[in-house]
Amino acid sequence: MNRFASNKKPKKTLSWSNTRIALLEHCERKYFLNYYTFALKQDFPDLRAETLLLKWLKSIEMRVGEKSHFLLSDYLHALKKWEITDEKIEELKDNMRREMKADFDYSKERDYSDREDFFGKFWLSEHFYGEEADSLLEPAIEKVCGNLDRFIASPWNEKVQDYFGSAKFVYVEHPRTPDFESMKVDVSKIWLRDVSVLAGPDFGVTFSDTDFLILDWKSGKEEVLDNTISDQLKVYALKMLLKKWFTSLNGIKIEAYEVYLDSMNSYGWILKQEDIDWIIEKINHDVEEQKQLLIDQNPYKNQPVDLMMFRKTTSDKKCEHCTFRDICQKLD
């Protein structure tokens, strides 16, 4: 009997994403706590409630990335409406400064009393664990605003303005209110059943029915890929193909880049058929790996095997900075 399983039917079937697979490879125990929290409800209701809270915690560094995406999206949506002036740019940055300060003050109160309603709450892991964080706020705000300044001063800003004026269609993500329905990938065409795949780029351009551009903004550590492009860009391209052309790039041009806001360096190229074939193979392989940690390997029921089957990382450094470090020790 699986003492960590819940009798309640999970809300979702098994899902795949690059983020989810990266977490599985990082630490299987953390993967369990992040995606199978419901399995703690029967035997560990208090720990389940605490785990739900911890899932909403983010470090201030992670919040910088999140807020950078918010601010750039705000700017691009205003630019798309031809509403951008120097005054408007300062207004957007001032709004973000106020938003980040208000969020920080809210987090600093450490009010975690409503343990069944964490959705949309802003909490910093530094505050939860009693770490000094006051000195981190202003540098974080300046980095977020600086990311926007660097984008505006870069050639990409001029290119984006040209796209708004000449392209057939331009998509700008709304990261504050993500549309999960529109993120769904039609995986039936790549032989997956009872598995959901979500993907949504930050910025997309349709030049014609056969010519596309995909951009993904990055605010973290710059990763230089030699002779390839990121898996995430490949997934975005696959999603686009699956909407109309199955999985063949024949006659279709999809150009994709990751743009690092800190340096404005970009990495990518025009997608090749081998990129599409490779990501299809990877998704199917990853799903098989995920299914090994499900009862009866059933992705529709999506019930995890016993917690102890989810191996903890052997890296002390990973554990030291893990959001779930206290919970993990209590479950051992």
Predicted regions and their residues:
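RecB-family 4Fe-4S metal-dependent nuclease core
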Residues: 1-332
